[in-house]
A protein has these predicted regions:
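Short beta->alpha connector loops at strand-helix junctions that form conserved
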Residues: 57, 78, 108, 134-135, ...
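Short glycine-rich anion-binding loops that position phosphate/pyrophosphate groups of nucleotides
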Residues: 33, 79-81, 184-186, 206-208
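Short, hinge-like loop/turn segments at secondary-structure boundaries
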Residues: 70-74, 147-152, 196-199
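RNA substrate-binding interface of SAM-dependent RNA methyltransferases
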Residues: 11, 18, 22, 37-38, ...
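Structured adenosyl-cofactor binding patch, chiefly the S-adenosyl-L-methionine
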Residues: 140, 147-152, 216-259
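N-terminal positively charged helical leader segments and presequences
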Residues: 1-94
Length: 259
């Protein structure tokens, strides 16, 4: 069983208690904030699960969370279970049975928990079915990632696969069209691509982009057109920003097609 961690932040803590309250064992609330409109419902949720609620000073919560960004609440809870290759297979089988188009987000070597959290948040907002990451060289779902995700970490299925390239082959064999973002001569503008069917979108780190083997597995490479400004131009975006732009285009097309 995974060791309990200290999660923090109003939305992250509320999501854990709402989605999997039995995984939590203790709640710390900053002294003087018990009756805050955002904190009182959290205490009420904790009470329904018989979770110990302790009042503590701000500095004590900062020490527990290892961050001053706790917003007055810290929750001791087991980390959310992460899916594996078998869960991905089950997801694909379920999608075929339902005949519902799926939208998957694949993150290749995203090691910053802040970027992972931001991507999870955007994925929930844009209707992503699941987020897939490799088992190695990727950020885990840390309390910091959960805080940045503002509750999305407990809403979005996260699947960790042993080998990302092999998982991509599996997706393609199951009829999923795989797009990868890259600055490449063969890449097409994002808006020129059909993102309305069973689609997987692969995002790489802002430093190195997607790996060569990952790029080779993609059905089509795409890029986000950037025009720059009078002040100059840049060649890349933060991965969470780029992910938001890519997922928005997918969401826009799928809404227009009434998917």
């Amino acid at each position: 069983m995974a060791k309990a961690q200290h999660f923090y932040g109003i939305h992250a803590v509320q999501a854990i208690l709402s989605e999997r309250g039995t995984d939590a064992s203790a709640l710390w609330v900053q002294d003087g904030r018990q009756n805050d409109a955002s904190v009182a419902p959290i205490i009420a949720l904790a009470d329904t699960y018989g979770i110990s609620v302790q009042i503590a000073g701000k500095d004590a919560l900062t020490k527990l969370a290892d961050s001053p960004q706790h917003q007055g609440v810290v929750l001791q809870a087991r980390p959310k279970p992460v899916g594996d290759d078998a869960d991905l297979a089950a997801l694909l089988q379920d999608a075929r049975a339902r005949q519902t188009p799926i939208l998957l987000l694949l993150l290749d070597q995203i090691t910053d928990p802040n970027n992972l959290g931001a991507c999870l948040r955007t994925a929930v907002a844009m209707g992503v079915t699941a987020v897939i990451v490799p088992k190695h060289h990727t950020s885990s779902l840390t309390p910091a990632a959960a805080k940045i995700a503002v509750g999305a970490a407990d809403l979005m299925p996260l699947i960790q696969v042993t080998n990302l390239a092999r998982a991509m082959d599996n997706l393609k064999q199951n009829g999923v069209f795989v797009y990868g973002t890259a600055l490449d001569d063969t890449a097409k503008p994002l808006a020129a691509c059909d993102l309305t069917g069973d689609v997987a979108l692969v995002m790489g780190s802002e430093g190195e982009g997607i790996r060569r083997l990952t790029a080779e597995r993609c059905d089509q490479l795409v890029y986000i057109p950037m025009v720059g400004s009078a002040h100059g131009s840049i060649q890349s975006l933060n991965v969470s920003v780029a992910t938001g732009m890519v997922l928005y285009e997918a969401c826009r097309q799928r809404l227009a097609a009434a998917i």
